[in-house]
């Protein structure tokens, strides 16, 4: 029997094993902090139960926490007579939420105090707070440079070689997303279409779509702020469409350029005479190896204003140049990278690609300087250590806290 504490990490099947790879990164950092790690597979309930029982026997009262991504496993037991599994076992469950709460909304609002949600950007956290109004804990933890346990390295581009610029992104024809809208009631079609018009009228960059949905609904006389079902339906539909539309714009701009695009769903594009290569998606561990060989990685943010996608953090973590779309947060925090950034109206992505191609050496120098700065400021490893601190606080106040004064006891009733 071990006298060490253990952390459970919950995983399952995801596209290209992205969550599986992130879970291995969590485990790497947690082990350096002195905790053992046990993996649970939510897709195999028999294996899940056996490993959990064995772990509880091996670590009696020393399972420090369970961690998952995207709400995996947070709802286990919610609808059973015994109640939520983590509450029953007194194991704090922390889930790192990567998507807008409008997607899989139940994963963002658990009925049990054992579950705590961690958001990597404030936009999603604030939507959760303002509209889902969760009864239990949430927190904000930004990622930081993702080194994947490797040392970042400065690129040394050769003048005789075309620099490797990649765009790892799956897409789909945005027009096909609008087809099902045609059978909806005319009022819903109006709100969907006017939300899109409002979004492009208000922003040329990222930005949440919820304000555009509200503006379109208000103009139609429909109040959505107290109608979470309709509100999140519109947000999910518009958010998905806008993101796919942006991928389409980027991919079309890249076709004449010497870029490698890794992803599914772009076979509808006419690649006749294209210089860009559209390649099949690869598993995440292979993608990390490609990151190490690249001079620049093209990214596209989610529709957010106050953080970036994890892809620029991967670029900075390996020492190469992130080429991403601009939002106010990016503009404020990465002014030296603005010449290599783009939006969807005035700053064409082809200009950023051309800048990399015209002067790879300067690109490499700027990327390396920014990589060093980011790795000193914040990394994914630092985020995981902060996560462990949050878990200890969450565990204490959920399962161990005894109010020292009568006033606090009354507040807790």
What do these predicted ranges mean?
Residues 57-75:
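Short N-terminal targeting/anchoring amphipathic segment
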Residues 86-99, 116-120, 143:
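Active-site proximal beta-strand in glycosyltransferases
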Residues 87, 105-120, 130-133:
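A conserved, positively charged/aromatic
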């Amino acid at each position: 029997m071990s006298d060490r504490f253990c952390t459970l990490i919950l995983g399952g099947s995801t596209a290209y094993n992205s969550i599986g790879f992130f879970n291995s990164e969590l485990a790497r950092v947690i082990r350096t902090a002195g905790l053992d790690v046990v993996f649970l597979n939510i897709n195999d309930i028999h294996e899940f139960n056996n490993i959990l029982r064995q772990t509880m026997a091996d670590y009696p009262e020393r399972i420090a926490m369970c961690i998952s991504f995207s709400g995996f496993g947070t709802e286990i037991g919610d609808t059973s007579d015994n109640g939520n599994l983590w509450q029953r076992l007194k194991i704090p469950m922390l889930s790192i939420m990567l998507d807008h709460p409008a997607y899989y909304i139940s994963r963002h609002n658990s009925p049990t105090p054992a579950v705590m949600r961690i958001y990597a950007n404030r936009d999603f956290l604030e939507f959760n707070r303002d509209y889902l109004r969760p009864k239990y804990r949430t927190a904000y933890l930004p990622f930081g440079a993702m080194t994947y346990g490797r040392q970042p390295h400065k690129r040394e581009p050769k003048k005789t070689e075309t620099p490797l610029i990649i765009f790892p992104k799956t897409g789909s024809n945005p027009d096909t997303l609008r087809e099902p809208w045609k059978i909806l009631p005319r009022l819903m079609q109006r709100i969907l279409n006017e939300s899109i018009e409002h979004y492009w009228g208000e922003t040329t960059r990222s930005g949440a779509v919820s304000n555009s949905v509200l503006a379109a609904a208000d103009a139609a006389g429909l109040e959505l702020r107290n109608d979470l079902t309709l509100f999140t339906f519109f947000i999910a539909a518009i958010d998905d469409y806008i993101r796919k539309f942006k991928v389409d714009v980027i991919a079309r701009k890249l076709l004449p350029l010497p870029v490698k695009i890794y992803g599914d769903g772009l076979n509808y594009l006419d690649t006749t005479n294209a210089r860009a290569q559209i390649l099949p998606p690869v598993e995440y561990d292979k993608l990390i190896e490609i990151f190490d060989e690249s001079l620049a990685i093209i990214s596209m943010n989610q529709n957010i204003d106050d953080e970036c996608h994890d892809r620029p953090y991967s670029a900075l973590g390996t020492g190469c140049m992130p080429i991403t779309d601009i939002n106010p947060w990016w503009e404020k925090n990465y002014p030296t990278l603005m010449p290599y950034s783009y939006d969807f109206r005035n700053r064409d992505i082809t200009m950023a690609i051309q800048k990399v191609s015209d002067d790879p050496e300067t690109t490499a120098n700027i990327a390396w300087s920014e990589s060093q700065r980011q790795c000193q400021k914040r990394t994914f490893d630092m985020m995981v250590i902060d996560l462990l601190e949050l878990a200890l606080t969450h565990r204490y106040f959920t399962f161990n806290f005894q109010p020292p004064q009568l006033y606090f006891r009354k507040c807790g009733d």
